[in-house]
Amino acid sequence: MATVKLIDEGAASPRVKAVFDDIKATKKIERVPNFWRALAVHPEHLELVWSRAKAIMKPGALDLVIKEMLALAVSITNSCKYCINSHTAAAQKLGMTTEQHGELLAVVGLYNQMNKLADGFQVEPDLLPNVD
């Protein structure tokens, strides 16, 4: 259960309604997801987070399905049940297959374990990226 009362689309202020309308148009969805309705209790924060999400999650060097799969990987690592479901649905809508989903989960599980082991052993980095 949410810790704030979700803002209903019909009761939204004009400022919030503008963001809600943009979310629905951009995501091509019929209703505003609960996450955005929760953020709407603070309209300025809603605008800032939506603006950032819209800028980052638009087509770019990474395909949209890859971006959603990355968002899903982070959500799994952060144990965000809402986010896991939301990003799984979004990635599936963009074409993520069951096989890709399973492979993503395997990679996330493997590297969560390996990262914890590297941190636990306090291993010094010896393979460094190129910086041009």
Residue positions per predicted region:
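Hydrophobic alpha-helical segments
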Residues: 1-132
